[in-house]
Amino acid sequence: MEGSDFILVVDSSVEEQVEELAMYLDNLEANTDKNVLALCREYLASENVKEVLNLFLTRLPLLAQAPEKELEPILAVFINLIQESAAFEDHVSKFCQALEQIADQNNNLTPAILSVLSILFNTAVKERQHARLSILTSVVTLTTRYSLFSTLAPNLKYFPDWLKEAGVSVSDHRAFNIFVSKAIQSYDDEQSFAFLLEAVKMDNSTADEAVRELVQRAVNSPKYFFFDDIVTLPPVQQLEQSTLQLLGILSGGMTDDYVSWVAENHAHCQHQKFDEDAIARKMKLLTIASLATQAPNNTLSYGDVAKSLKIDENEVELWIIDVIRAGLVEGRMSQLTKTLSIHRSSYRVFGKHEWVALHEKLAKWGSSLRYMLQVMEQPLSSFTIASSKKGNRDGSAVTASE
């Protein structure tokens, strides 16, 4: 799918195209009635093209028996027929349903059907919003149903622009994002979460099921650590106080805060399907990250980690390895001094204190750079003076010899 302007050219009249498609359907072994051509001629005689198209739509699933190499050309004929239809968007919707039925009956034809959907998408006028929604919905359905996600993945980033070009309403766009999120979750959890997050951002009016699912997935995910972009969303702020307290702890609290919270909210966790063990593990990693940002001289002792996590000091290295793997901290461990030398740490909340700390680090860095520049310039100046003196001596020697 390209999303660019596309012109489909079929060099024949409407009547010839109708007869070609009707004869093809009648010749299929699965079509026992063999009456498509006769009915089409009857409808054409009364200039009832709409009934011709409706008839084709009911018989297109017969193409499940067609050879793969013939499917795309014959369906291109139907695409051309519906281009000038007054009920174009309705016909596209039913056409997409028929294509899904063909794939369900013969999933070997799915790649060819996706190619047909691509042609249909590129020939559909951008402003026909419901047509684009129908086509993209079928593309997502077929690629995820028949394990062809690799075909879909490169196009996901274009979905917002394509729907915006078509003028799709906010409510329809939101519903589509939720649909995509569910469809692709087993293939790409990160992309799925991104579509759900965008859906939640589109409606500030209520905390519906999508909002609760977003929070649940973020809280339980072993890879999601920064909650600022979720906590501030208006629909999330409408959730019950217990959930907001948990999000606040995940944003800037420590392990002790979570232990206290979960002791009072065990039933709430079960009701909201929050994974207490997964959150406890996440809080330990986040606690280490916070300790790392506050460590004096960028050195964190194992003892401080053990104290904050309420664990034996012998377990600290394993947790530090996990927090480094999670990308929250970078550093070097020393078994001799039982410390972590911190090279980089992630701030969970970036407020006034963090801005002050950043300013101090940048000032220190600037001072170090100025000192290094002075050190580097000093030998260069000495070398220039020495070279000048040597040149003068050589010149004098030449003059004397002459």
Curated annotation (Swiss-Prot):
InterPro entries named among the record's database cross-references: COPS7/eIF3m, eIF3m, eIF3m_C_helix, PCI_dom
One Pfam family recorded for the sequence: PCI
A cellular component term, taken from the record's GO annotations: eukaryotic 48S preinitiation complex
Subcellular location: Cytoplasm
Any one Gene Ontology BP term: formation of cytoplasmic translation initiation complex
Coiled-coil segments: none
GO molecular function, one term: translation initiation factor activity
Highest taxon listed in the record's lineage: Eukaryota
Record-annotated PCI domain positions: 188-347
Entry keyword set: Cytoplasm, Initiation factor, Protein biosynthesis
Record function comment: Component of the eukaryotic translation initiation factor 3 (eIF-3) complex, which is involved in protein synthesis of a specialized repertoire of mRNAs and, together with other initiation factors, stimulates binding of mRNA and methionyl-tRNAi to the 40S ribosome. The eIF-3 complex specifically targets and initiates translation of a subset of mRNAs involved in cell proliferation.
Complex formation: Component of the eukaryotic translation initiation factor 3 (eIF-3) complex. The eIF-3 complex appears to include tif32/eif3a, SPAC25G10.08/eif3b, tif33/eif3c, SPBC4C3.07/eif3f, tif35/eif3g and sum1/eif3i. This set of common subunits may also associate exclusively with either moe1/eif3d and int6/eif3e, or with SPAC821.05/eif3h and SPAC1751.03/eif3m. The eIF-3 complex may also include SPAC3A12.13c/eif3j.
Family: Belongs to the eIF-3 subunit M family.
Descriptive protein name: Eukaryotic translation initiation factor 3 subunit M
Organism from which the protein derives: Schizosaccharomyces pombe (strain 972 / ATCC 24843)
